[in-house]
């Protein structure tokens, strides 16, 4: 059974959750304003797009499998960003409280 955005924001340390399309259109969000969700989705879409380009290039040059992308994680300052489902579903979390492994697994559902 897929984990809902409500379930995600109820996980320890998770502040907000969101989903978006490859072009950065925010399709759903929890615990954040519409305006902030739109900005988050646009920025995360850009990062996902960059990782997709890097992975394609690495695959071609190294003849190793780097695609398809499953997701990415950023940790900086006191916050963590975790994206899964190809980099189109994610959460922002408090780094000191979140279990990256647990949230990553829940996002992959």
Labelled PLM ranges:
Residues 1-109:
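Non-catalytic interaction/Regulatory regions outside core domains
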């Amino acid at each position: 059974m897929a984990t809902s955005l409500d379930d995600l924001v109820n996980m320890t340390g998770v502040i907000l959750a969101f989903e978006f399309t490859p072009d950065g259109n925010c399709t759903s969000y929890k615990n954040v304003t519409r305006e902030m969700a739109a900005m988050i989705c646009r920025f995360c879409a850009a990062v996902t797009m960059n990782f997709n380009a890097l992975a394609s290039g690495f695959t071609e040059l190294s003849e190793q499998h780097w695609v398809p992308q499953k997701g990415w994680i950023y940790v900086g300052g006191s916050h963590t960003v975790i994206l899964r489902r190809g980099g189109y579903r994610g959460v922002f979390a408090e780094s000191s409280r979140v279990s990256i492994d647990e949230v990553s697994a829940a996002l992959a559902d």
